[in-house]
Amino acid sequence: MPVSLAVCETTANVVNAALRESLGSCVARAALSADEAKTSNGGGDGSSTSGSSTDNLQSQIVANAKRVLLAKIDYEEVDNYHESVLAKLKSKYIVIKPDSNGGAASNGNGNYNGSNKTNGKFGAGNGHDNNGNGNGIVNGGTSALNGGNNRKQIVVVDHQSSNQHGSPSNPNELPKPKRVLYQREHIRIGWKQSERKWQVGTGMLNVGNTCYLNSSLQALFHIPSLANWLVSESAHLENCNISESCGSNGCIICAMAKTLQSTQSNQSAVRPFLIYSKLRQICKHMVVGRQEDAHEFLRFLIEAMEKAYLMRFRNYKELDQLVKETTPLNQIFGGYLRSEVRCLSCNHVSITFQHFQDLLLDIRKSDTLEDAFDGYFSRERLEDMGYKCEGCKKKVSATKQFSLERAPITLCIQLKRFSMMGNKLTKQISFKPRIDLSRFAARSPTAAAQPLSYRLVSMVTHLGVSQHCGHYTAIGLTETGSYYNFDDSCVRPIAMQSVCNTNAYIMFYELDVNGNGHVVAPKMNGMRLTTNGGQQHSSPVVATAPAAVVSATATSTSASVSAAAVTSPRFIGPQLPNGYGNSNGHALGGGAAKTAIQFKTTPQKHQQQQQAQTQYQLNGHINGAAKFQTGAANANANKSSCNTLNNSKQHQPQQQQQQPQHILPISSDEEEDSDDDNDNDNVKTNKAPQLPSMPKMFEESSESVALTAKLKPKTALKSLVPYESASEEEEQQQQQQQQTLQQQAATNSRKRRSGADSSDTDDDDDEEQQQQQQQQPSLILRNGHAKTNGNLLNSSSSKTKSASNASSANVNSSKQKTDAIDEIFKSLNNYKNKHRNDHNHVDDDDDDDEDEDEDEDEAQAQAEKKTVTKSSSSSSSTSLTNGWQQSQNGKATASPKTPPSPAVIKTKTGIWQVTRNDEDDDENVDGVADADDDDDNDEVAEPAVVTAKNHKNPFAAGKATATTDANPSAKRQKLLNGSSKSQQTTPRIGNGYQGESLPNGNAVVSELLKQNHRGYGSSVLSWNGKASELDKETFDLVCAKRIAGYGAAAADEHCCDVNSGHSSNYGTNYKSLNNDMSSSSSSSSSTNSSSNSSSRSNGNSSNCPPCDLLAEAREQRKRDDDDEEENEMDRGRQRKIKSASVKCGSGATAAPPGYNPFQEYESQKRWHSNKSGSYSRFYHHPNYRSNFQQRNKFKHNRFAGGGGGAKFQQQRALQRHLASGGGFTRRQHHQSSGQQQQQS
């Protein structure tokens, strides 16, 4: 036998027989021939070194034979032993002395000793070529072949290697690997290919900044091809033998498979500990507990899984790169890009191939995913003279363009949202659940006729503004066709509209082709790789597996004919396009006719016929059962006869779409088509049953707001004002009050102007009601009162008219001023007599609630409240104020002609007179008010019980300054717009100072404080000629109430309840608190002020008439002097007064059970200045900050700094106090009283 090592079987007996044969004479002769060839190549004499070389070669063969015998032989079950074992073994061995007709073989078998030199020379000459060919095979090079038999053997032995490095067959074709580790046909695409039932999957617990890990795993587990492969690794899972090198829990593939099974079997969230514990194994620089990038983790995770799979093979380190790219992970995610660089000088085209597992798309100049693909695969120009052309042999300008040589089964897309500096591009990129990449594939026209369709199966989203902070979530497609959002342990369904509007970061698209059995390599993926043989053998390969491979650039005519024969029946006639026209996807290798019959099932065809027209009109997609499928009509400009199928289905009756039993299981696909394409077709108004996880309520309501708003009284804007819905009865009362007041004021000479305003308002109501129906239809029928809600948008116009009315009203004579005051008291007296037994308490509660909600509901509440009371406001304000409409209709305008309207009240405690100390003091005519004082009081003293809706009683002992408005400018604007309902029709409109100007509603006390601090400490009030301490008493009362446990919101509520007289408990408690505080404040409250406080509380509980008259008089006073600039200045000072009062009052109380920020400031000041040891520290709780100095030594030393630090803190506190309007004497008093209470 001339061959030393022939094709060997893998059994031990065959190896031993080959070893014995190699040690015989045949081995010696063959070895001698090889040795002579080597000596001839080296230029030496063959006879001199033949003996030693033969011994050396024989010793090497014996050593290698022993190694083969001692090696462990693994057995593996294969389908075809001849093709999978013997054919592969041929590529491992080199023929030392092949058969040839040149006489070398016969001479080699002949006289060994006699013709050594001659045979050696001839053999050496022929051996040079053979050695050259052999070395070319081993090293990857190519050389000229001399003999036809030599060519045949070389091609059989290593045709793959010669193809890999540019064989003469076709250098522009993708090279073939020597060995395929995992066949592409074994990948099962789609959930339907698995035998098991796939659940939605549970969430994953976040164990500390692991949202990137959880979202990445969820996205991978919802890729059907990857999930099916992980489940199929059960045999490896049981017999994993690489746990020693990959950790105690097994390899990373086993950890992934176990984690996937746990998410499918458990009902609650799982902890991905098997993956989290191998984080350093996946990537060395990743740290447990630190935030990482999801895409980076994905890349390292897939690479670790590939390495774990390669470790199953003994010689995995010796495998070349092409073989390593045939792992299951590369078969799923891997693809090849074709790069064509064209020289602009000689038009030479250089073609290279690049392996990829994901596409990184630049979105800076794109708004849609299709635009990003166009930019990625577009032709770009390289920099001038920067490319060295192989044809020109010089640097020239060139263009470069990518195309898909082999499309992956699962396409991973990463949008470049992060820069090198960590900044994030947060622009919205719109995408569709199905994409077609046929126009980017480098394929023949025959293969290009079939669309390269992908379906969105999962995605990873990032919430945040930077790469270094944020949160990752995942979205996955389940077997039912619904999408679910996976936010760590939270799993919830998500509509297709929300999916497409998500700022995606990583997206996974899978080929939209499924099969019943083992999925073969799809024809639509544009690949040219065949797993059996090269391009020369494409014809036999297609014969054995016709649906597995279609060579797009087949070199033989038979291959092209076979490919056309397989694919042509799919596009002829109106039959369903098998493999992609329905849910079955890939075709099996059994022939075209058999495949076509196999996929013609009646239920699927019926479902497609009833949806074909709608889906084709939307985006040309053809639905399968709960799966995305793509029609061939929109594949590319290369039209095929598949359009006949779509056109024929387009003319199907539309009534088939309304069959609920067929539409229900695939409603999610209909929504995906309709929502993604944004078409206004039949699907938008389809009344077919929808899946509960994917509603279309938002889109439908947004398109038909004008229709649904008239039928639904409850709208989203109405919910922003929760107390407005219970005001129908109040609106009716206000309308009645408006009519009554107009009749009572009919004799007034100035009513003509108010009537004109009312008519103008009605006209505006009609116009603005029509405007409202067009612009804001959700408020047309808010409470069923179209008239009261018609003035939603006329705030600016109302301000303008009110300003003009006020300015015209201010040009009256002094006689008209006196008549205006008389008219005020008469109208209020008649109003109280008429509405004494009406529903007063409901309005008070509603007004209190509205005052509390003014800041957060400003925009909607202002518009709605103003709408409710605009009509009544214009007329009632004119009748009440005899033409002064400043507080009613808008902002108060300043005018020197404004009448003073003083309030002189005779009560049980004496005659009270309130004067002014502001810029308008010179213009107030107090004498006129004094002249009318007794008459007015006699008229209004009769009703003894009373206030109709006066919950802002001026004498209510409420907290006037404790609650600081969070947004004073918003409150002011709301006040000027006249948006409060009861404010404009109730007798609170006295002398101009509205109780609603402050949150607590204590109008008189707040006004007294404001006037008192105009001079920063000068008293301007007189109580029977005596200086009043009301401002200081109010500070104590307010602070006492807060310290007693009432919160800010509760204090407002209690104050309103006490003022209105509806809660006897609150009134009693507050009165007792008032009395206690009056008695405890030695320096700030006198006996007279204490009795006055008690009498005011009692008067409030009994609703005395003088209190009401005083409130009315002060409301009228406010209308006279409130202009915009003055009001703004007053509010700024008022806010300072509030801060000072709270600070002063907080130190003069006992240990508070609640929290007070100003008390915290005072306590912190005492903590910092405690080194002097003057007094013991005070804490809110016995164990609260007991070791503050020991635990915060740095802060203590930094801010306290011994005596100097305490002095500095005291000085700063004093400066803040004085700047806020407080007095020095008052501060010392409260600080000393606070120290006494703390020491006690």
Curated annotation (Swiss-Prot):
A GO-annotated cellular component: cytosol
Residues in USP domain copies: 202-512
| Catalysed reaction, written as an equation | Thiol-dependent hydrolysis of ester, thioester, amide, peptide and isopeptide bonds formed by the C-terminal Gly of ubiquitin (a 76-residue protein attached to proteins as an intracellular targeting signal)
UniProt lists compositionally biased (Low complexity) regions at 47-56, 101-132, 650-662, 733-744, 794-815, 869-879, 1076-1103, 1231-1240
Acidic residues bias: start-end ranges = 668-680, 759-769, 843-859, 918-941
Compositional bias per record (Basic and acidic residues), positions renumbered to this chain:
1111-1120
One molecular function GO term is:
cysteine-type deubiquitinase activity
Q: Which residues carry this modification: Phosphothreonine?
A: 715, 898
Q: Which residues carry this modification: Phosphoserine?
A: 725, 727, 895, 901
Compartments it resides in: Nucleus, Nucleolus
Active-site residue numbers: 211, 471
Enzyme Commission (EC) number: 3.4.19.12
Indicate, by first and last residue, each region the UniProt record lists as having compositional bias (Polar residues): 639-649, 880-890, 976-988
Any idea what job this protein has?
Required for maintaining multiple types of adult stem cells, including male and female germline, epithelial follicle cell and intestinal stem cells. May function as a transcriptional repressor by continually deubiquiting histone H2B at the promoters of genes critical for cellular differentiation, thereby preventing histone H3 'Lys-4' trimethylation (H3K4). Controls selective autophagy activation by ubiquitinated proteins.
| Subunit structure and binding partners | Interacts with atms/PAF1, but not with CycT.
Give the protein's recorded name. Answer: Ubiquitin carboxyl-terminal hydrolase 36
